[in-house]
Regions:
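Interfacial loop-to-helix junctions that mark the boundaries of transmembrane helices
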Residues: 1-2, 19, 49-60, 167-179, ...
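Core transmembrane alpha-helical segments of multi-pass membrane transporters/permeases
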Residues: 26-29, 48-81, 106, 244, ...
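Re-entrant/interfacial helical elements at transmembrane boundaries that shape
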Residues: 69, 82-85, 115-128, 156-166, ...
Length: 414
């Protein structure tokens, strides 16, 4: 069987198994195995390609585990809640959608997972929604839209692994996402949300915010600022501080600055727990990426885009979008797309930095489909049923599409 068709069958099998609620990791490994065998490679060669795919992303997995220190600091010390509440308080009720979106953007941009960012902000959104009788759909889209914008400029696993597979500096890939993220935020808040139907309004008992012992805003910001400064040393001064060092150093400094050094173990355990799940998932995506990379599927995609103007450029976001749709995950989508198509994208004349940035942006278009955990975690945070949550999918995709179009336009015209 043609290796491109075989790899595609393996990918479809993985999707079906994930939808059927089988473990995503085992679904991806099984899909990779079936794809390789159908391609006629034999068991030994198939396994070799699967292991090769995992080896390619091993450095990124190590960096992602190290990033757990910063994530643990932001969530367990209360720094994330402080930052979100400060933004919402500063902008006030009149600009509540902007406040929620900006809070989600900044939290994800600092290294908080997008689903964790939404869950962190959701209690405040519910309180404000009940108080002002706002649409729960618009409230959730504001948080998800802001989170997607922050995700393309964050030191989160999707950006780390895209940069790694394209051999591009993480700080430069993050910087490439800044303007698309700002534009995406403005479009989300001032265009998409106003055009949405109101849907069901928030109704319920008015709740008061819990009086938690949270760190001061300036203390909460120290850890992320240290991380950003360390990563910025490469483009500014030519001093290379690897993300494997910068991210945990920023996290440890943040833990000390917020006065939670006695709870450092809890912060580290939380971060490791969040990242270990991603790391294990990436082992599965690595096996499938190895099979896809060894197949002729990239040649088929190149052939399909050959007649298009800027077809090589479009390969990056299209690959990101298709793979994120297959896995319903930004990280897994960016992993498979960048590991499988990076060489072809760079060979088409796209720079490594913008190749990684466009794959990353493309991975936000369809990463919220129902066979992924993000769909259910975010819907649950606002008390939505599956039927209600499904209504948001088109609007989420529009946000991702805006980010992608802006990223491609910046590469082509700026």
């Amino acid at each position: 069987m043609n290796s491109a068709l075989a790899a595609l069958i393996g990918l479809v099998l993985s999707i079906v198994l994930i939808i059927r609620k089988l473990s995503p990791v085992y679904s991806l490994i099984l899909g990779a195995l079936v794809g390789g065998l159908l391609a006629g490679w034999g068991l030994e060669t198939t396994v070799a390609q699967m292991i090769s795919g995992v080896k390619d992303i091993t450095p990124a997995i190590v960096r992602i585990i190290a990033a757990g220190v910063l994530t643990g600091m932001l969530v367990k010390t209360g720094a994330a809640s402080t930052i979100a509440r400060s933004i919402i308080k500063a902008l006030g009720q009149k600009y509540i959608y902007l406040a929620l979106a900006l809070s989600a953007l900044l939290l994800t941009a600092m290294g908080v997972f997008i689903d964790v960012a939404v869950i962190t902000i959701a209690p405040i959104a519910i309180i404000m929604g009940n108080r002002l009788k706002l649409s729960k759909f618009k409230l959730l889209l504001a948080m998800i839209g802001g989170g997607k914008c922050g995700n393309i400029l964050s030191p989160n696993p999707n950006t780390i692994i895209a940069a790694e597979n394209f051999d591009a500096p993480l700080s430069s890939v993050m910087a490439a996402g800044v303007l698309p993220a700002i534009f995406g935020l403005l479009v989300t808040v001032f265009v998409i949300i106003p055009l949405m139907p109101k849907g069901e309004l928030m109704e319920g008992e008015l709740q008061e915010e819990k009086d938690e012992q949270l760190p001061a805003l300036w203390r909460s910001l120290i850890g992320p600022i240290v991380t950003i400064l360390l990563l910025a040393l490469r483009p500014i001064a030519g001093i290379v501080v690897d993300p494997m060092i910068a991210l945990p150093v920023g996290g440890v400094v943040g833990i000390i600055a917020t006065g939670h050094w006695k709870n450092m173990s809890a912060c580290l355990s939380y971060g490791l727990d969040k990242m270990s799940g991603i790391a294990i998932l990436l082992v599965g995506t690595g096996t499938l990426a190895g099979v896809i990379k060894a197949s002729a599927i990239k040649d088929v995609l190149v052939g399909m885009l050959a007649g298009w103007s800027n077809g090589g450029t479009l390969m990056a976001p299209i690959a990101g979008a298709l793979m994120s749709a297959a896995t319903a995950s930004t990280t897994a989508g960016a992993t498979i797309a960048s590991a499988s198509f990076a060489d072809a994208i760079v060979a088409a004349g796209v720079t490594a930095i913008w190749g990684a940035a466009m794959v990353n942006a493309g991975a936000t278009i369809l990463d919220h489909l129902p066979h992924g955990s993000f769909f259910h975690a975010t819907g649950g945070s606002m008390g939505m049923s599956v039927k209600e949550r499904l209504k948001l999918i088109p609007y989420e995709s529009i946000v991702g599409l805006v980010l992608t179009i802006c990223s491609v336009a910046m590469y082509l015209f700026v």
